[in-house]
Amino acid sequence: MNTPKKHKKFKAKMILQIIMVIIGGIIAAYGLETVLIPNSVSDGGVTGLSIVGSQLFNLPLGILIAVINIPFVWLGYKQIGKSFALLSIIGIVSLAAGTSFFHHTPAIIEGDTLLITVVGGIILGFGMGLALRNGGALDGIDMLAVLLSRKLPFGTSDLILFLNLFVFIFVSTVFGLQGALLSVIAYYIASKVIHVVEEGLSGSKTFQIITTQPELMVETIRDQLGRSATYKEAYGGFSHEKFKEITCVINRLEETKLKEIINDIDKTAFVTVYDVAEVKGSNFRNLNHH
């Protein structure tokens, strides 16, 4: 009975994802063509290889981005699924078309290398992060890294770094050593922006707290942050004492306040903090600050 309604909702969500992936591709293309490439700064991954090929053989950048990414999109289809591959194709086509559209647009920044790498990295990272957040990708090298990590005794992040090392060596043959180093910096900034856009500024964190005053700690967290917490019975390996370990998941924006609460109640508390990829259930997103 609810099937037509669910189908309509899914269709609307898919259309929104497609629009956002297209916007992401266009933004990334703008960053490349108006900030990075005019100042001899490249990107990593397939886009970086495409930029090198474009400069060496005087071929349109958009065509190279589209062609070189084809096998990687196929890998994405095999590893992740049809929806991801479709959105990635849309994103890559948008990026490729965007580079052609903005190719003759004057550079918005020139001369200041620090500003170029920072602004270029931010624009590029925002575009790529927007695509990833909505289920697509603008560069295929990550898909290759995932496949290789299943065959080799290395993690995905290590392989991405290793593969990009070769990309930046190629970049140095076109843009020189300085251009390659600036490209590394821009790539690093872009990767951080991608993480922020994909996960959001308000990503979650888990605090594990061992304190002599667990009841007061939990009560204060509830009253001041509006957050619940759970107890877990733990046993000290050195002291052989039983104690209550508190686990509390908070919004990243609440981190400073929680640290203040912990410090006020028990300066000797043992605290472990780690990032959380996703939180579901209950009313976690509803803040109730006092």
From Swiss-Prot:
The keyword Transmembrane helix applies. CDD domains: YitT_C (cd16380). Belongs to the UPF0750 family. The keyword Mitochondrion does not apply. Its main location: membrane. It comes from the Bacteria. The chain crosses the membrane at residues 18-38, 56-76, 83-103, 112-132, 165-185. It is found in: Cell membrane. The gene is ydeO. This is UPF0750 membrane protein YdeO. It is a multi-pass membrane protein.
